[in-house]
Swiss-Prot record:
HAMAP family hit by this protein: NDH1_NuoN_1
Gene Ontology cellular component annotations, sorted alphabetically: plasma membrane
Pfam family, any one: Proton_antipo_M
Chief site of localization: membrane
Bilayer topology term: Multi-pass membrane protein
Protein name, UniProt field: NADH-quinone oxidoreductase subunit N
Protein EC: 7.1.1.-
Claim: NAD is one of the keywords in the record: yes
GO molecular function terms listed in the Swiss-Prot or TrEMBL record: NADH dehydrogenase (ubiquinone) activity; NADH:ubiquinone reductase (non-electrogenic) activity; quinone binding
Alphabetic keyword roster: Cell inner membrane, Cell membrane, Membrane, NAD, Quinone, Translocase, Transmembrane, Transmembrane helix, Transport, Ubiquinone
Signal sequence annotation: none
Transmembrane segments: 32-52, 57-77, 97-117, 126-146, 151-171, 186-206, 231-251, 264-284, 296-316, 324-344, 348-368, 392-412, 431-451, 473-493
Length: 512
């Protein structure tokens, strides 16, 4: 036997790797152009921060904004360049309408975060330029999570995002609470990564492939292959549930949200959550079996229902607004995952877009208000309307949208999602519909408390007494754009228009 005959090792598939050319061509590279721009830009920023050791790293800040804008444009270019659902890198990468919109969400949220954060870093005396490269690397991981069609690639991309977030949360090294939040998130995040890796191993054991479509095919087969695939998928979904912060895998969320710098919290609540939910959505669009009354509908459905109830009940008693938004994000994740369990795609995507903008806007205002106090609570914002009426109006618009009050975008996002659930006749979807409507009504209480505190309280809060910081250009721009999207901009992206616009851009021949 020839020991150098690689064909005797079919399990490792080394012969194919060695004998076939794996050099990517230009179309392959262009298919991941947004990720390439972000990754290359992150490395360039690290080099730039060494060359220009200015105290406030102004050059690094502006160059990072330029790179994010280039990445945003690269998403459109990639969509025009590869119309329709295209596969690249031997099926490892897929450019689709879904990945197009998700990538726009991630990069938009990163741009908003980069605009908000400079003055926050200055106020906390954080003089580390690494913040901006880490932001780019985390966003790069999100884009690869969305376009990746191989479990190994998806896992590596998810870990790239997670590791960057661990560091970003602990950026305020002098704050012990921030370090505690980092440790909790890191330990539980590592635990969830173990679940995902074990799930991938079982999926590979049942199918012999790590390609997502191929690995899920044994779900329809009886015997050990089907059982391996089922165990693997359950473990993988469990790991993703940690990242989404679904109940009961949510324990890291309140402390991580409160301990991190507020712009980082906003980025986690929007881009990172959208990336994890987007991964689950893509996974469920590739299931080779119907969802009606199946185990794969009940599993995320139960997690979604428990998340709605738990998140809203715990948010009721929170005084700190960041912790309240943390529990609120658990509830909102429940609403979105309820749609995924019902096989709904377009309404889930619309909900993610609207939620991202209203959440980012709320955190942008909290970041601004924190300049007058250590923590923003219900008591510290009392009588805010008397001192800063525009700020009080803006923050209440975002909270009313999060609560689902018409005519704001959050109301329509919930309405479209609940309408789709109502059209289904399955028991699980009916339960989720009742749970969603009931919990939305429950959420009104703690969101309306903000309006009462800011406009109707006779007491004067700490922020009303001490806050004298001027509006920054970055925060003002982000808040105004988010207000526009939440108030009227959502109309352009309603379900029916959303995928149609995506298909229109993907089918355009302007760059071909």
């Amino acid at each position: 036997m020839n020991l150098f005959d690689l064909s005797i090792l079919p399990f490792l598939n080394l012969a194919q790797v060695v004998n076939e050319s794996r050099v990517p061509n230009v179309p392959d590279l262009l298919s991941v152009l947004p990720a390439l721009v972000l990754a290359t830009g992150g490395v360039f920023l690290i080099c730039l921060s060494v060359l220009f050791k200015t105290k406030e790293f102004i050059i690094v800040r502006y160059v990072s904004g330029l790179i994010l804008l280039l990445a945003f444009a690269a998403v459109f270019y990639t969509s025009f360049r590869f119309p329709g659902n295209g596969f690249h890198f031997s099926g490892q990468i897929e450019n689709s309408v879904l990945s197009f919109w998700l990538n726009l969400i991630y990069i938009s949220m990163a741009i908003g975060t980069a605009a908000i954060v400079p003055r926050i870093l200055k106020n906390h005396k954080i003089e580390f330029p690494e913040f901006y490269p880490l932001l780019l690397f985390a966003t790069c991981g999100m884009t690869l999570m969305t376009t990746g069609q191989d479990f190994i690639l998806v896992f590596v991309a998810l870990e790239l995002m997670s590791i960057c977030l661990y560091i970003l949360i602990g950026m305020a090294r002098s704050d012990l609470f921030s370090l505690e939040a980092t440790l909790k998130y890191f330990l539980l995040g590592s635990f969830s990564s173990g679940f995902m890796l074990m799930g991938i191993a079982f999926l590979f054991g049942g199918s012999g492939s790590t390609n997502i479509t191929e690995a899920l095919k044994p779900l329809t087969i009886a015997g050990y292959q089907g059982n391996f695939a089922k165990i693997g998928l359950v473990l993988f979904i469990t790991g993703v549930a940690f990242k989404i912060a679904l109940f009961p895998y949510h324990a890291w969320t309140p402390d991580a949200y409160e301990g991190a710098l507020t712009p980082v919290t906003g980025y986690m609540s929007t881009a990172a959550k959208a990336a994890s939910i987007g991964l689950l959505l893509i996974l469920y669009t590739k299931l080779p079996l119907p969802l009606e009354n199946s185990t794969w509908a009940w599993l995320p459905g139960i997690l979604a229902l428990c998340s709605m109830i738990y998140g809203n009940l715990l948010a009721l008693k929170q005084e700190n607004l960041k912790r309240m938004l943390a529990y609120s994000s658990i509830a909102h994740a429940g609403y979105v995952v309820a749609g995924i369990s019902a096989g709904i795609k377009e309404e889930v995507l619309f909900y993610l877009i609207v939620y991202s903008f209203m959440s980012l806007g709320a955190f942008a205002i909290l970041a601004y208000l924190e300049e007058g106090t250590r923590q923003v609570t219900f008591f510290s914002v009392q009588s805010l309307s008397g001192v800063k009426p525009l700020t009080a109006i803006a923050i209440n618009i975002f909270f009313m949208s999060l609560a689902g009050v018409p005519p704001f975008g959050g109301f329509w996002a919930k309405l479209f999602l609940f309408q789709k659930l109502a059209e289904s006749e399955t028991l699980m979807n009916r339960i989720l519909l009742i749970g969603g409507v009931t919990n939305s009504a429950l959420a009104l209480y703690y969101y309306l408390r903000i309006g009462i505190a800011t406009f109707m309280s006779s007491d004067e809060g700490e922020i009303s007494r001490n806050h004298a910081a001027p509006y920054s250009v970055g925060v003002t721009g982000v808040v105004l754009f988010c207000l526009l999207m939440v108030s009227v901009g959502w109309f352009l992206l309603v379900p029916g228009n959303l995928l149609a616009l995506g298909e229109l851009w993907l089918s355009s021949s302007i760059f071909r």
